[in-house]
Amino acid sequence: MSGEPELIELRELAPAGRAGKGRTRLERANALRIARGTACNPTRQLVPGRGHRFQPAGPATHTWCDLCGDFIWGVVRKGLQCARLSADCKFTCHYRCRALVCLDCCGPRDLGWEPAVERDTNVDEPVEWETPDLSQAEIEQKIKEYNAQINSNLFMSLNKDGSYTGFIKVQLKLVRPVSVPSSKKPPSLQDARRGPGRGTSVRRRTSFYLPKDAVKHLHVLSRTRAREVIEALLRKFLVVDDPRKFALFERAERHGQVYLRKLLDDEQPLRLRLLAGPSDKALSFVLKENDSGEVNWDAFSMPELHNFLRILQREEEEHLRQILQKYSYCRQKIQEALHACPLG
């Protein structure tokens, strides 16, 4: 991406609250591979996706379906994921959604990955992720030092109420596809500039892969939280996937190694930016899939939690039925062998 950076403005945002109610189940899903700068033939909606090699997802897979957008959860049947070795697809979906996947498996992509470690291997120089609390005078001094180091007009500004505003840059490194509202004309990144925002109820959706070099600058408040940054990015790209499918990471280069850390929902990216300074090597932000395997059950609504309990009970009953059937079959074969043996 070239030219002047496009900015996303985040001002006064709604206070943190419980996640919204679960979306209605998808009636019909359309999936298209959107190639940047090229038109797509709408008739491809009827063509099954090619190249995928779906396998059962791992036991730690707790994520959202790339087709219908619903949460994938279970103890035994967690879902399917594309495991094609020569591709970087990772398309993940429910078992029930497999037949509806129309998005072709993406070929090998240079995503610019670098080896990352989550903890320092040098015990003499531990990585400190804690951030100190600054006084108002220290914040003012930090802002002056920050503005003196940058070579652009993306300054930080101190407000009268003690808060401050500034800019953060987020790089999107998404392996899996994202979903946008389906329309007569397939969406593009340029369409995001004209969109009003994410809809609350989307029953038809189109999936595509975002370019690997997508970068966005956001103008945020010091109290803007990581979760709000994710939601703003999704609105800008018209993405209707659940924000909990994604996570914001901080990336740092130290001693020739790259360190990644997942930000908590309530962490304040601009505060981290101020403490680290303007250097991208000292700190940069990356949006990735939230594939840590951890589930924050408190973030789900009551209807969603009750639905998960029903799924768990149904899966437990099915698993018990299969076990009983297996042992019953084995017992029957042993009894048949006993009856076939001659007496004495």
Curated annotation (Swiss-Prot):
One MF term in the entry's GO annotations: identical protein binding
InterPro entries given in the database record: C1-like_sf, PE/DAG-bd, RA_dom, RASSF1-6, RASSF1_RA, SARAH_dom, Ubiquitin-like_domsf
Name used for this protein in its record: Ras association domain-containing protein 1
Zinc fingers (Phorbol-ester/DAG-type) by residue: 51-105
Bias type Low complexity, positions: 179-189
Subunit field text: Interacts with MAP1S. Interacts with XPA. Binds to the N-terminal of CDC20 during prometaphase. Binds to STK3/MST2 and STK4/MST1. Recruited to the TNFRSF1A and TNFRSF10A complexes in response to their respective cognate ligand, after internalization. Can self-associate. Part of a complex with MDM2, DAXX, RASSF1 and USP7. Interacts with ECM2.
Annotated keywords: Acetylation, Cell cycle, Cytoplasm, Cytoskeleton, Metal-binding, Methylation, Microtubule, Nucleus, Phosphoprotein, Tumor suppressor, Zinc, Zinc-finger
Domain Ras-associating: 198-292
Organism listed in the record: Homo sapiens
SUPFAM superfamilies cross-referenced by the UniProt entry: Cysteine-rich domain, Ubiquitin-like
Disulfide bonds: none
